[in-house]
Amino acid sequence: MSTAPSPTITSPTQTSPVVINKSLICQDSTVSNGVQIAIGTVLHPRSSIIISEGAGPIIIGENNIIEELVQIVNKSPEPMIIGSNNLFEVGSYIECKSIGNGNVFEPKCKILKNTIIKDQCSIGAGCIVSEDKICENNTIIAQTQNSQIQTTSTLPYDHHSSIHMTHLELLHKSIPLFHTIKKTPILEK
């Protein structure tokens, strides 16, 4: 997994979420204490980033898009590290060990515990990635009518990377027009 710039852990017992300036967190999203979110990330309304009792922090890199009803949950005592430029689409459920950069998680996919998703992967709508799995760079997992298939290709990443920054810019302009933005402790970068 490539190393994505991410905020430093200030304290495993910090009392509030830490958000680097220029991230956008909607008021009706849920963010646990101990979560760190880097610059540019957008949390849509009704998204949740939850640290269970006794679990480690969740550290989220730059420029991620976390859409409605997404649940990112850490139940492990180890930190959950999420890289940069990822797209988590509506209703996806993430309970993994780590995620690299430039990945797409389509609606209602599930990533189960201890899973490692490396860089530029695409997890299809409704797919379930089993516990303890490692998805190497450019892995594609898709659901057919009767089964789940896995292959590798750069095509999904090429498409995702070509529109991701434009998508982020649009969200940073439009979301504050229609939603209240959460006031959180801000670290200037």
From Swiss-Prot:
InterPro entries: DCTN6 (IPR027777), Trimer_LpxA-like_sf (IPR011004). GO terms for biological process: mitotic spindle organization. It is found in: Cytoplasm, Cytoskeleton. GO terms for cellular component: cytoplasm; dynactin complex. GO terms for molecular function: dynein complex binding. Its main location: cytoplasm. Keywords: Cytoplasm, Cytoskeleton. PANTHER family: DYNACTIN 6 (PTHR13072), DYNACTIN SUBUNIT 6 (PTHR13072:SF0). Part of the dynactin complex that activates the molecular motor dynein for ultra-processive transport along microtubules. Subunit of dynactin, a multiprotein complex part of a tripartite complex with dynein and a adapter, such as BICDL1, BICD2 or HOOK3. The dynactin complex is built around ACTR1A/ACTB filament and consists of an actin-related filament composed of a shoulder domain, a pointed end and a barbed end. Belongs to the dynactin subunits 5/6 family. Dynactin subunit 6 subfamily. This is Dynactin subunit 6. It comes from Dictyostelium discoideum.
